[in-house]
Amino acid sequence: QHKAMQEKMKLAASAFQSQQKKLTMKTDITTAVGNGWQLHHGDCVRVIREIESESIDFSVFSPPFADLFTYSNDLQDMGNCSDMEEFMGHFGILIDELFRVMKEGRIVAVHCVDLLSTMSKHGKIEFQDFSGEIKNAFRARGFLFHCPITIWKSPVTEMQRTKAHGLLYKTLKSDSCKSRVGCADYLLAFRKPGENQEPVTKDPNKYPVDWWQEVASPVWMTVDQGRVLNKDGARDNNDERHICPLQLDVIERAVELWSNPGDLVYSPFTGIGSEGVGALTLDRRFIGSELKESYFNQARQNLANAKAQLTLF
């Protein structure tokens, strides 16, 4: 009976949303090109199918978090899926193409967080294993699970931002069986099988043992959560959620660890250009795609500015 009620609520919500938003589908691809970078405005699957096989040296990105956020009203937007199963079906198409375009022996790094279900939407409160779903999807399509990295985040900041019941001190006092720990971020690294024909080498003068010991830690404790690109210019009047750019510390560590200077770095979900700025700053090349126009415009500006600033010094 409760399940039937949930389905009715879900259908009602979908009907309401369809009245409020006119769904669109962008089928063309427009391209911006700069010094060392290309940015494509269009659906990531359409874009990646135009990329040459085994041409990408490293890929790093943060995908839409299943059905958690609504980013645009485009039918191709993976954030518009109704549930985890539908999202993973669409995401799997992209993973197939990622396997094709990646060079052998090279790495794809995926940023994610496990999602908390809610009573209003799911009828229960528990963590959904989003990171596990991503691992299964990549492994099912031929990738090897290279390593997981946990990114520490402050539970106090999470509590203040979300007012999550499980993090409140009053919950601890009233019934600590309802208390939980804070949510970490994850960077999941996957490797395409085969021999890497261009080893990623490190100069010990630039990368001393201290650097390696910090990066080799299974938990990155020193990521500055506030070090992100300025997102204000990418907002549009129809945004339902706040934009949350990936931390530059995470991007830069991954780019330095798993690619060489001059390598081609790819992000299918460029957003406002964080991965591209990180790649260009570290003397890599970048190719990306972004479906939402306001994000694309901001990313194009950020990429151009990043390269311009480098040429000044």
Q: Each predicted region: which residue ranges?
A:
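Asp-based, Mg2+/Mn2+-dependent phosphohydrolase catalytic module
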Residues: 288, 308-313
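A conserved SF2-helicase RecA2
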Residues: 1-24
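Acidic, low-complexity intrinsically disordered tails
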Residues: 23-26, 311-313
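Core catalytic lobe of class I
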Residues: 26-298, 304
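C-terminal alpha-helix
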Residues: 8, 302-306
